[in-house]
A protein has these predicted regions:
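N-terminal strand-loop-strand
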Residues: 1-24, 50-51, 74-76
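Short, well-ordered turn and helix-capping elements at secondary-structure junctions
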Residues: 13, 28, 58-60, 78
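Nudix hydrolase/Nudix homology domain
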Residues: 18-22, 83-132
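The catalytic Nudix box helix
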Residues: 24-57, 72
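Short, contiguous acidic/charged loop-to-helix segments that flank catalytic cores in large enzymes
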Residues: 27-31, 60-63, 103-108
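Hydrophobic pocket-lining residues within nucleotide cofactor-binding pockets
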Residues: 29, 51, 76, 87, ...
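Acidic, glycine-rich loop-and-beta core segments that form the ion-binding/anion-interacting portion
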Residues: 39-48, 56-61, 66, 89-92, ...
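Active-site-adjacent beta-strand/loop module that shapes the phosphate/pyrophosphate-binding cleft
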Residues: 60-82
């Protein structure tokens, strides 16, 4: 899930990841839960941020634990981050910082073939296109 607000996006990091690596937020759908409800709940649990305008982006099969990853964009309704217990860090990244991490600092973002990376790249390109 890529949460955005203007020219900033919300990314998080797990303690087990390599130093400085950040990615989109992620989670699982609970039984009986709508996908949009899962996005809203997971973002709230991991960051304290409320979201709106949840939009489906795409999917990717994931070998472990034999899952289907679904990518969504969501617009932030609130901006104040409340750190939880699930992630080591969650923070807002400016589009210029995000673009630099995508292009220059390998190992700081998810692998090229992941839906998380595709979400981040698509968001950067969209924000830059709006500025032209």
């Amino acid at each position: 899930m890529l949460v955005h607000s203007g020219d900033h996006c919300l990314l998080g990091r797990q303690a087990a990841w390599p130093e400085g690596m950040y990615s989109t937020l992620a989670g699982f759908v609970e039984p009986g839960e709508k996908l949009e409800e899962a996005v809203s709940r997971e973002v709230k649990e991991e960051s304290g941020i409320e979201v709106k305008n949840i939009r489906y982006f795409g999917s990717q099969p994931w070998p472990f634990p034999q899952s289907l990853m679904l990518g969504f964009f969501a617009e932030a309704e609130t901006k104040e981050i409340m750190r939880g217990i699930e992630l080591e860090d969650v923070r807002w990244f400016h589009v210029s910082e995000t673009k630099e991490l995508l292009t220059k600092l390998e190992g700081r973002f998810p692998h090229l073939d992941t839906i998380a990376r595709r979400l981040i790249r698509h968001w950067v390109e969209s924000v830059e296109a709006q500025k032209r």
